């Protein structure tokens, strides 16, 4: 009932981002801008020498993706999914924006604060690394318990 008929398609009319100080890429430039976005991200990841540099590249590219704002709706969700995708592609614990960090994340985006986005990304990736380590430990404990039975 509330499903848009243009879901999954590039925008055809200008859009705005509420609370943001930037103007999204015009529709006629979306495809070219996305091509440049991917090239720049992949180059930055190739040049990165550490996990932190990779997270920095991913978070900065997220800001660029949100500036392109290629769809009429769902750009935030797609952008955050791309953060997770590129973290996994680079074997980095994914940056998952939790509810408790939403305001900080939105403020960093709206203020175009690359440093804050990087710090948030590093912090959340580390939190996810610890969570994964705990889960692996719990699985091992359970498997040991099953073997002893």
Question: In which residue ranges do the predicted regions lie?
Answer:
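FIC/Doc superfamily catalytic core
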Residues: 1-149
